Amino acid sequence: MDFYRLANKTNLKTGETYCYTDFEVVRSKDLMVRGKSFYAVWDHAHGLWSQDAYLLRQLVDDDVSRYATETDSHPLLLRSSDTGRWDKFQQYIRNLPDNSVELDCQLTFNSQVTRREDYASKRLSYDLRDDPPESYESLVSTLYDPRERAKLEWAIGSVLAGDTRLIQKFIVLYG
């Protein structure tokens, strides 16, 4: 991740070496901050953004632990409150300017490959397929007359196309 570097420091009294994260003030592509608070982190393994601060902690701690093993040092993990690293991280976040993009502006289907620039934080549990929607046809043709059905399908199409943020209209279904 690009918002910290791994560093070592040695305790002069005991001679023990510790591994820790040095949070860098940079325009990060992996971390989003909104309103002086953590907003999202890029989870490379899943190809999605995550708004879970505990996942961020796990990703950073895994990196620190791996580096500590390589350098034969003691890891100072975010998970442990005694190390003070979580407090340092929270202070770091509060000092950063806003750096965020709205997440999930477009639908992401199950097998769709995502990139960081797609700003997706969740996937639908199914894929979009080109199959005849027999049940949908039966239900919608029973409930709506052709003009109202066309309006509804236009709205659904705008959601699927990702145009809803550009269109200032909405539809309410009730009954």
Describe each region flagged by the PLM.
Residues 31-54, 98-175:
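P-loop NTPase catalytic core of nucleic-acid-dependent motor ATPases
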